[in-house]
Amino acid sequence: MRITGGELGGRRIPPPRTGFVRPTPDAVREALFNLLPDMRGGRFLDLCAGTGIVGLEALSRGAATAVFVERQAVNGRRLRELLADFGLQGRSRVIIAEVRKGVKILMEEGRKFEVVFADPPYERALIEGTVACCRRGDILVSGGLLVLQRSVREIIDPVVEDRGLILKAERRYGDTVLSFLEQAMED
């Protein structure tokens, strides 16, 4: 596994230390960052971060900051080590917590992000809960994007648009689908 672009492009990331991580493949990450707006100066949130490869990619491509929320402590500690090895600790933060608690912490701090990337474990009925958590947490800037990585066998509840998120696009890569939901603009 390697970072595909930006200042850290080509740097290798060690494999996960647990068997419960499914890193986003290189080709899917490249496609993701080709579809996202320019990350330079932006704030990026990586939920269900696992190895942290997607947030590392955002930092490599110019994001001002990235916050990683990862439930498994072994992965969170390893991610902190990687960020230090790459000299990124001043632009990043790792929260070792499940998504709901991590979002609550960020909400209480008043943090908002241009891009929130969420990659919950496939086919465990976590997509709707992740979307609802992000909406309740009010962590997206007006016009910000929530990108969900999910299995092709999972669907997004059509009521997400009633929650202030608009499904803008979906892209399929084998069994993986990236869904791009935009935070409705404030009046």
What positions do the PLM features span?
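Class I S-adenosyl-L-methionine-dependent methyltransferase catalytic core
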Residues: 1-187
